[in-house]
From Swiss-Prot:
Catalyzes the catabolism of the allantoin degradation intermediate (S)-ureidoglycolate, generating urea and glyoxylate. Involved in the utilization of allantoin as nitrogen source. Keywords: Lyase, Purine metabolism. The gene is allA. Belongs to the ureidoglycolate lyase family. GO terms for biological process: allantoin catabolic process; purine nucleobase catabolic process. The keyword Amino-acid biosynthesis does not apply. SUPFAM superfamilies: RmlC-like cupins. Pathway: Nitrogen metabolism; (S)-allantoin degradation. Its EC number is 4.3.2.3. It comes from Chelativorans sp. (strain BNC1). GO terms for molecular function: ureidoglycolate hydrolase activity; ureidoglycolate lyase activity. This is Ureidoglycolate lyase. Its cofactor is Ni(2+). It comes from the Bacteria. The lineage of its organism: Bacteria, Pseudomonadati, Pseudomonadota, Alphaproteobacteria, Hyphomicrobiales. The keyword Translocase does not apply.
Amino acid sequence: MRKIIAEPLTKDAFAPFGDVIEAEEGTSFPINNGKTQRFHDLAKVEVGGENARVMVSIARGQPYDLPLTLNMVERHPLGSQAFMPLTSSPFLVIVCPDESGRPGVPRAFITKPGQGVNYARNTWHGVLTPIGEEQDFLIVDRGGEGNNLEEFFFPEPYEIHLPER
């Protein structure tokens, strides 16, 4: 089995795959008479296809055991897909570059508290992967007609590990 070590999630490292969603001072301004700080325009939501619309959902994910065996990735050709945790627990983010319509070698990231991700339209990615405990996530993605899911099963799985401490 091929081994992948998860790396810390950063905006620069994740940029080829989408957006890191997090509250940073450079992206905020006060609203509501100064009582609220708005962290603005943190991700590009993409929707395409017939009768496309933006959906907001909540998912409750069960934790995965580590190391994680990665057999499959998926992508959404008609829209982006964002996951924002509603807890402070970390989760794994797995993405692959596209290589002529197939996923390339995966990269794995581990989030820190307060980080979420927005997978850009057509980005190969792993499934929602909470670690440590059950977690709830706010999901922003595409609804509408048309097939918005493509799955790829690796002929040989990868094994995802957290970095050594």
